[in-house]
């Protein structure tokens, strides 16, 4: 008498019930808190949405870094009374001339104190400062990783579900956001660096002369926008008194005149700096600048204690909310340029889903008919195992919130054939044993045992390929790899455990004289 392994029965029941619970939200809405309620996430090609390829402007980042170093050098040279001239930033290098080569030793010490990784090239009294290639690569990787993280936080703050965000090539970022109805808003929040800085207004500068290009060395000309006066210019000090890196909160609100504004709060350090700035500069104007554009320049009437402030300007409710979002998340290390944009409509996604359903249904039906015609009753068991494998796949995709793409559907359809292939291999081995004249029980046990190693080997090699596709692939390729991996694991379980259990139950309780394989 064939004894049914209890662990197989328990495992099969638990897995099947759990799979039904996880897959159920794809068909009906469940509001019970103790049950899973997430359905499968549909990718861009199935749901529609926006596909953006972003270019990280590393040259701007490098140039800004060199400008900051150059400003620090000027300050240090004045403090140490080192004579120099023609200190300029060109082609991401710093160039200068010293009046005497005797100061080179002191100069090198100052430079390495600012940044020990700067390479110093000396040609008589001319000096060139630059970064090595390895240092540039490290900086590029850092900037790209920071940009990806900031973009992810900005997208997540909009409530968008399951954005696909990954590095592509050297300095490109691929962003796919399914289900986006307003790509222009998406581009708007990505197109801003959101670098917030506070400067004193240069009250002594002549605006007309500054517009002509005659600007004091320690000042700069920036543009503002007023609801009443339109565009205008103002001269501010270059020195950044405080930056947005110290912000902890930012939210859209309304002022006493019911006009939109942005309220913000600083952390402890930022609050102390803000208090000192307002205390020491009473009667002066403080310029609030975002991405080199003036937001406002209010008069400082006295020390502001507590670290809270407001930004007023020509805001709408939408622009105030947008600015608050950008300030909360933080600034990008460098601007991002959209170099490629594609939008996929929801109708096209619906057509893709319908095509995938038809292909899957045709493939499933053909496989089921083939198995029944070829193997009779145990072919039916293979079909039942196949249905359960599809259930497990759907459950795992829902449980792990994996994104299903059109290539992912292709991967699932492919695993349907692979699942049946394992059963075919097992059944052919059983048939070989039956031809030797052995009993049904012995043929079944030997057939499964002899086919087991072959099934594991073939599926393992496919899994290795799927892992490689996931690691090195992008976008749809990753979706295919995920679906293929989940499909292989599910099909192996159904072929080895479920099919064997169904055949054992049939043989034990129905005691067929023949298995229908001869």
UniProtKB/Swiss-Prot annotation:
Coiled coil residues, start to end: none
| Bilayer topology annotation | Multi-pass membrane protein
Q: Which organism is it from?
A: Rickettsia typhi (strain ATCC VR-144 / Wilmington)
Subunit note: Forms a complex with SecF. Part of the essential Sec protein translocation apparatus which comprises SecA, SecYEG and auxiliary proteins SecDF-YajC and YidC.
| Similarity comment: family membership | Belongs to the SecD/SecF family. SecD subfamily.
Its name, as the record gives it, is Protein translocase subunit SecD
Q: Which GO terms describe its biological process?
A: intracellular protein transmembrane transport; protein targeting; protein transport by the Sec complex
Q: Kindly state which keywords UniProt assigns to this record, in alphabetical order.
A: Cell inner membrane, Cell membrane, Membrane, Protein transport, Translocation, Transmembrane, Transmembrane helix, Transport
Mention one GO molecular function.
Answer: protein-transporting ATPase activity
